Amino acid sequence: MLISKKTLGVLIPDIFSFSNDQIAQKLEQMGIEVESIKQFNSPDYLQLAKVVSIQPHPHDNKLFICELQIDKNKFINVVSNANNINNPDNINKFVIVAKKGTELLNGLIVKTQNIKGIISEGILCSYIDINPFSRQIIEKTEVADAIIIDHVSNDHDWNQYLSFLSLDDVIFDVKTPTNRADLHSLIFLAKELGVLLKTKTFLKQKSSVVNHDFFKFPLNLKNKLKANYFGGLFLRQINQHSSPWTVKGLLINQMIKPVNYYVDKANLVTVFTAQPIHCHDADRIVGNIELKQATHNETFVGLDDKQYEIEPGDIVVCDEKGIIALVGIIGSKRTMVQPTTTNIFFEVVNCNSETIKQTAKRFLINNFASKFMVKPISLLATDNCLNYLQNSLLTTDNIGKISHFSSSLKVEPFSKKLTVNFHKIRQLIGIEKKELTDQTIKKSLSQLGFKVDNQLLKIPSYRQDINTWQDISEEIVKLIDINKLKPIGITSSFNFEKSSYFNTFNALTKLRKKLQTLGFHNVITYQLTDQKSAKTFNLFNLENFITIKNPVSQNHSVMRVSLIDSLLKVLKTNNNYKNELVNIFEFSFIKTQNNSELHLAVLWVEKLFTSSFNPMQGISNDVFTMKGLAKLIVANLGFSCDFEPLDDSDYFVNNQSLKIVVFNEQIGFIGLIKESLLNNYDLNNKPIYCLEINLDRMLSSLNRIEKNYLGYSKLQPVCKDLTFSFTNPASHFDQFANMIKRITGIESWKLISVFETMQNNQLITKYTVRYFLKNDANKPLTNQTIELITNNLKLQCEKLKIKLDI
């Protein structure tokens, strides 16, 4: 979930007086996990400019010469091909200009240019020029449009353009607790956050327009599903236009695609209330409108131009011609709001979330609406939605154009009652009465929306997570901050002993951080799986599986004996939801009836250290880099490893897989997964390398390692670097490794870099090796000896047709 600080500022006006870290701390205190805080980095030399004149280019009818005022007495000419610039109404409006010397985020450096005989001293910026990462969210028609700003105050600093695009915003990327669907609503979230920040909140939005003049809702709606609510508002005789860039920017910041003025308003209302709204062109609706469950198979075309196969049981909204919306998922193309639309029906539904969840899962959809509708939505959230929508539409231009609600919604403010004992709450928290009085508890709960009558507590209707008095204790802890509670030691009749040799937890923590630094993402998956999956990727040939008696489902009936299958299912799920695939790893115990051992598994899917500006950059996944990764993991635990061939594997491609061996004992595998297996996970479109290691055998050996310490040599170590590539594609790095071991005078070597580069229009993989020469105190190295060793190494490389970078 993305939280915009500027959007939150509508409900908590003082939010900008708090630092981002303070807000993040309070969100964490609420039980919300803050994953990242994002701010926009603006390029230098961008500023607002006033359009003075627009003239056609004398030599190209697709270009226009714009005279711009960039300061009180400074003017420049800019040649532009923006689709929307040639309009007399743009005179005296403002644009954003990138002046000479600007380096845009897409890598473009702006220079003064002669464009067909006219000097251009900059470029008019489109939104993509300033924020290239939003390309997938912007309408295609706006990609080539210049940003036009209607009005800028006389005292505004023209160098400060970010606020007009809402790029001065801060975005908190968060995860809400699974039992707090209400926190998807910014209104409910702001209520709690305001209490923790000890500042005022304004949760009821009211229009400044006094004369409402609402008309009777004109459509005939039938709630055949008997849903909690089915209805909405009607807006008539409107003129369609785009939203201002301040609104578009807010939506883009939260990964919502701007559409037009009224649809954007509805989407912002959804952000505030967590109640999705479908917008329909009312003139395209035929006859009565029904909310119902589909009774037979049928198809309809959605807003995204895709055909959807509706099955019996799916919840749909229909008119007399057919389906106009798949509830909580997507509207139909037939009734979508278009530039010519003059009458809009804003449809709001509150119904069974479980059915919508199953439908969304079948269609592999995880869009803006379904994220909210797959969880229960309180009636209070629906009521907030209707009121926010009506007030947001209520402008002086729309007086007499907005209907009453189609039907009234009766909302009970409180859903249940609990009897609480304040003394028990203090005991559970571990705090004295003088530190937390009864009055303080009552005041705190009242601020959070609870109604307190002595020890009888009324629970707000949107708080479905509150069921026992212990849940109330959790609410109190949030307010007093759990970090401020004094720790109380655990009384025990025995002492915990800490190993003086090694701390396994620290070793694994260090290894986890190392993998995360390299760009791998830590995941946690289920221990239980089905019979078929349990036998897939049984790399260690384990037997005596643990089976569950009376399992919840057959999909969770057996304890897994490998982590690879679980990780591939993670990639499959993300791939189905069109999420970008990343490299992942997991630590987990593999349990059988005989044993329990700690394993580490890694899936390498994409290049490491890539750049969005240079896709060629990065380290590719191949068997050589997998060997390096395996060595790094084993070395992190204080061991070294060797590799042995793996023949006729059921899981890996031949010549692309190896056994990992430590002290002549096989501890794991690396390899390229066979495409036939990846077909089962819908992942056969790219190579996936995997690694699985039994860490238990190494960890149990750590305390019995004997170490020999050698004194430092008085002689300075001698090392040299060598960069090379293979001229023969069939060559292997192992050929170089075997050769360099045989060179007299070379004590050791290590691979320090692998990179790809273009050479003669061909992608070449290059390797850089650092080798160390023996420098014996009895026979120190001379320049002549070093040269002999180096020349011998070069000669051996030539024999193997290894091309050196000299």
Curated annotation (Swiss-Prot):
Q: What is its EC number?
A: 6.1.1.20
Please list the cofactors this protein needs. Mg(2+)
One example of a Gene Ontology biological process annotation: phenylalanyl-tRNA aminoacylation
Give every B5 domain span.
413-487
Stretches assigned to the tRNA-binding domain: 40-153
Cross-referenced SUPFAM superfamilies, in alphabetical order?
A: Class II aaRS and biotin synthetases, Nucleic acid-binding proteins, PheT/TilS domain, Putative DNA-binding domain
The residues that the entry says bind Mg(2+) are 465, 471, 474-475
- Output the Gene Ontology terms for molecular function: ATP binding; magnesium ion binding; phenylalanine-tRNA ligase activity; tRNA binding
Q: How is the cofactor bound?
A: Binds 2 magnesium ions per tetramer.
* GO CC term (a single one): phenylalanine-tRNA ligase complex
The keyword NAD is assigned to this record: no
* Subcellular location as annotated: Cytoplasm
Q: Does the keyword Transport apply?
A: no
**UniProt family annotation:** Belongs to the phenylalanyl-tRNA synthetase beta subunit family. Type 1 subfamily.
Q: How does it assemble?
A: Tetramer of two alpha and two beta subunits.
Could you identify this protein by its name? Answer: Phenylalanine--tRNA ligase beta subunit
The taxonomy runs: Bacteria, Bacillati, Mycoplasmatota, Mycoplasmoidales, Mycoplasmoidaceae
State which gene encodes it. Answer: pheT
